Amino acid sequence: MFREYPDILSVSQVADALKIGIKAAYALVNSNKLAALRVGRTIRIPKPMLEEYVRTARNNVKL
C-alpha cells in the first residue's frame, strides 16, 4: 500500500495519497486521527501510521 510514496510523508503527500484536500489532511493530523511527527516547523507522517489509519478507517465503515 502506498509503495510510490516515501517512508515519511508530508501533509501534502498524505492528502494526495488519500485523495483528500490539504485542509482535510491537516484536520486529520490536528484531531489526532492520524499520527504525525513535528520536525521543526514541519509535520511528517511515517508511512506505517498512514497505513494504520487506512486500516482503522476501513474497519470503522458501517454498511
Describe every region a protein language model picked out.
Residues 1-24:
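Polyanion-binding surface elements
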Residues 10, 44-45:
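Serine/threonine-rich, low-complexity intrinsically disordered segments
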Residues 14, 33, 58-60:
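Extended rod-forming repeat segments used as scaffolds/tethers
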Residues 18-44:
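Major-groove DNA-recognition helix of helix-turn-helix-type DNA-binding domains
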Residues 22, 47, 54:
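Short amphipathic alpha-helical/adjacent loop interface patches that line ligand
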Residues 41, 49-50:
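A generic "binding-loop/recognition-motif" signal
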Residues 50-63:
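A short, Lys/Arg-enriched interface patch at domain edges and termini
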